[in-house]
Regions:
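A short core secondary-structure module
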Residues: 148-149, 153-189
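A short, Trp-centered hydrophobic/proline-enriched beta-strand micro-motif
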Residues: 119-127, 171
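A structural signal for short hydrophobic beta-strand segments in well-ordered beta-sheet cores
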Residues: 141-144
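Short secondary-structure junction/hinge motifs that connect adjacent elements
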Residues: 27-48
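Residue-level signal for inorganic ion chemistry
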Residues: 9, 105, 187
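Active-site-adjacent elements of ketosynthase-type condensing enzymes
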Residues: 131-139
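Internal helix-loop-helix
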Residues: 49-110, 114-120, 161-167
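Intrinsic disorder at enzyme termini
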Residues: 1-8
Length: 191
């Protein structure tokens, strides 16, 4: 058994390495915890997308390249070797995007995935709450349907990138009578 990269994988490594050498900013971007830095990182997301590098494993129909796990690992190795900027949209790209691909409606996929891939929509996460921390079963913020809208009542904390994001996703208690690890709904909220 020969263990190593195939010729096409080696060629792929050269391709991403070359693109990164030409495009990674020579001066590090400001922190994305500031307005200026956030906008710089959003522009980087757009640049990645223009080179078709923003979502290497996503299906082509959602703005990706449709690559496999080995190619994704090659991409990640080269990305970090080049000291490329941190991904400001990692909450959307790595957490919400795959969830929508698996469980989202066609309408949700159409509305959110391409905008996520291009950097048009930056996402924050809304998991944690005071008194709940990382214990998702302890969530108390509620979401109840009233007409064609949901009324959300409660508080979230440590919402990564919420200060500058366009959208947030989070877990909310939609059935307070259920067992504590049930009755939760994932909601997408324009902020």
């Amino acid at each position: 058994m020969k263990i190593g990269f195939s010729d096409s994988q080696k060629k792929f490594r050269e391709e991403i390495r070359g693109w990164l050498e030409k495009n990674v900013p020579k001066i590090p971007l400001n922190s994305f915890d500031t307005q200026e830095g956030f906008e710089e990182h959003r522009e980087w997301e757009k640049k990645l997308n223009s080179g078709n590098w923003s979502m290497v494993t996503w299906p082509k129909q959602y703005g990706g390249r449709g690559l496999n796990l080995i190619e994704w690992l090659i991409f990640e190795e080269e990305y970090y070797r080049a000291k490329a900027p941190a991904r400001v949209n990692q909450n959307g790209v790595f957490l919400l995007g795959p969830t929508l691909m698996e469980y989202g409606s066609d309408k949700q996929k159409e509305k959110f995935l391409s905008a996520m891939a291009t950097g048009e929509h930056i996402w924050s996460q809304g998991w944690s709450e005071p008194g709940a921390g990382s214990d998702m079963a302890a969530i108390r913020t509620t979401a109840f349907k009233k007409g064609d809208k949901y009324i959300i009542n409660g508080q979230k904390t440590w919402s990564s990138r919420a200060a500058f994001a366009d959208w947030t996703f989070g877990l909310f208690r939609s059935n307070p009578e259920s067992e504590r690890h049930r009755g939760l709904s994932l909601s997408l909220i324009h902020i």
